[in-house]
């Protein structure tokens, strides 16, 4: 599915009545999220649906798809956890987190906390502006931009898939200061450091394959890293406004030491987040939608073509995904109720098999791993590497 999950673990059990009130208040500030996906003759489209966001007991499998005729967000509760599951059709991680953040602030207020004025929502109508639901891709689209260069196919993990439902999930908690210190020693950000660990572990798995298996596998290791474009192009949109960079190493050039990977990833990510190169990416995404012959293709044919393109031009080009929720900013009165956050990306497809989400809050950073295979070798090696760097790792039970 294209459903991702944001989870907040509170220090105390969730109070259902205050939470329901908070969700009802928050949805007034996000009316553009109260929509369902509809099928037209040429395109899918979003249509307003006058329903309230469901607050349900968290007992079913993670990131399951939304049924037809339903809203594309659900709120799930269990013990001391609140989870928001959202379809990527509706928004990206930043947009979904803004909604969850609003719920948490209102929840803490309902529980008796006094919220600073700058975080208060006294008038939902004044909070909603056209910029909140603008199509920012179209706003920053430029014509006559040269196309992106097609990338070669990448290495994929060799593990066998489980039978359905195959998606399992586990996470680990790491002291934020320790991982930050390790990254600072290398002169890079936490994201660059973790992407480098990801590539280093993939390299080790590749090198441990037997000769014939290694011969058959692609030698490009490449990680897809989503980028919040609001940090590059000014926008307050709550709709999707993210693209990705794909740092890589090429094992045809030989074995990479970890420091070599860090250096390479740092410079590749700097280059690929340059505004001009991001414009090429936006041009590719938006430009195809504007072509008359594309607009005139019936939806059933578009869906067939996109499904084929998804594998040939999509997941075949990268080996894994690492998405970092970024800095989490909350008023102290709300933050005091919270232990930590967990970010779970959409379940990986049959080709990718594993994905990784990162969330840092207060003194804790969580690493979550989604897995659709029989093996946990990747997660074990990833966390073992961090432990070898003297970074304490507290592993949580998988589900």
Residues of each region from the PLM?
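Acyl-thioester-dependent acyl-group transfer interface
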Residues: 1-39, 49-74, 171, 204-399
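Non-catalytic, low-complexity flexible loops and terminal extensions
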Residues: 90-98, 102-181, 386-399
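Histidine-centered acyl-transfer/condensation active-site motif
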Residues: 67-109, 120-130, 359-378
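Short amphipathic alpha-helical segments
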Residues: 190-199
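Alpha-helical hinge/cap motifs
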Residues: 88, 183-191
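Hydrophobic/aromatic-lined pockets within catalytic cores
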Residues: 91, 104-111, 184, 198-210, ...
